[in-house]
Amino acid sequence: MGPFWISTPPTIPSSDGTPSSVFTPSEWVKEISVSMLRRFDLHTHSFFSKDACNSPEELIAAAVRRGLDGIAITDHDSCEAHDYLRGRELPPGFLVVPGVEVSTAEGHLLCIGATLPMMKGRPAREVLQAIKDAGGVAIPAHPFDKWRAGIRPNFLDTLDIEVLEVFNAAVTSRRYNDQALEYARRRGLKSTGASDAHHDSAVGVSTTVFEMEELTVPALLEALRKGGRPEGRYLTFREGLKKHFGNWFRIFNRRPDRNPK
């Protein structure tokens, strides 16, 4: 028997923070080739976000060390990282996915597979349409997390979305991930897991595994719409401290170097 592909979101236990190695009923599972499995972290932040400090290259290097096939750099209301990387040499066999985390009027919305003009503060429906027009996929980030500008369920109900982030490694309470997973199941949405890394040590803590024949942005977007398997764990207490407090000193000292000559 070969490896398995979970075509329906797995149950993610909140007791130990590990959503991987989850068994599902046999009717949810099919056998596939290992060569088609690709692992992505679709929610990361570089020093082009005000609350993060690592360069795009450092995020990429961390992802490569951890065996990922690609990342989406989704800075807050900024696509500068992708302009920054244009023309720079990237690791072979690794995909950097365009993206941005937009602070809409109703909460945070990820754009995956495309870049956008500045849309901070615009209505979520308007941003959602802009993402679709740009050819990307819209994913509400850390929904239900009221302390981190997650879009609340009563408004989520009105959004024409296909995918939901059901496991965010940095949520302020694990119940928010449980609620997101239940909501995705109820609406029949596809699921993702991501680190929401604001420093390179958190990259790849949580990821999504996809079935893909090609390592390209169009293939990833197609796989997103078909559905992936969230994997990984929550940030440790130490990692959480680094995210919320330790970064500020590093940001103060690193941000002037973000455009090295």
What are these regions (language model features)?
Residues F23-A52, P56-A61, E80-R86, P91-P98, ...:
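Charged catalytic cores and adjacent phosphate/nucleic-acid-binding surfaces used
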Residues I139-W147:
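Aromatic-lined carbohydrate-recognition surfaces of secreted/lumenal glycan-active proteins
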Residues G121-A124, A141:
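Ordered, amphipathic secondary-structure segments that act as subunit-interaction surfaces
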Residues D75, H142, S195:
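Glycine-rich, histidine-containing beta strand-loop boundary motifs that form or position
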Residues L59-E80, V137-I139:
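Divalent metal-dependent hydrolysis catalytic cores, especially in the metallo-beta-lactamase
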Residues F4-S21, S26-W28:
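Low-acidity, Ser/Thr- and Arg-rich intrinsically disordered low-complexity segments
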Residues H43, K132-P140:
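Acidic/glycine-enriched edge-of-secondary-structure segments
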